[in-house]
Amino acid sequence: MLNSHPLKGSIKAHGCLKNSLGKDTIIVAKFLISTGALVAALGIAFGAFGAHGLRAKLEPRMLEVWQTGVEYHMYHALGLILIGLISHWLGSSTLIKWSGGLMLVGILLFSGSLYVLALTGTGWLGAIAPLGGSSFIIAWILLAVALLRTS
C-alpha cells in the first residue's frame, strides 16, 4: 500500500517523475527553484532590514519605496519557484526558460532600483524600475503562453 498514492499513476502519465525528465529539464528546474528560494531568503532579509534597520534612518516615503521593492521581490521570488516547479512537471520549454530569466531580471531591475533609490535618493534610478516591471509582465505572459501550448 505504500506505493498506492492516488496521484502516482497520474504523475507518471504526465511525465513528471524525475526518471522521465530530460537532463536539461532537471537542471533548469533545479536552477529556478533554488534561485527562487535564495532570492526569497534575500527578500526576507531585505524586508527585515527595512523594518528594523532603516525605519529610523529613511523618510517615510523612501521607506515605502523600499517596502514596494521588497513586496515585488517576494512575489517574483515565489514566481521563480513556481516556474521551476512547472518546468519540472511539464518540461523546460524555451518559453518557460525565458519566463524564469525575465522574472529574475525583473527582480534585479525593479526591486534593485527601488532599493538603491530608497537608500540614495538618486531620482534617475526610478527610470530603471519600469524596465523591471516590463520584464515581470513579459515573464508572466510567456508563462501563460507556455502553459496554453501544453497538451
Where are these regions (language model features)?
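Polytopic transmembrane helical bundles with strong interfacial aromatic enrichment
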Residues: 23-151
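Absolute N-terminal positional cue centered near the fourth residue
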Residues: 4-5, 31
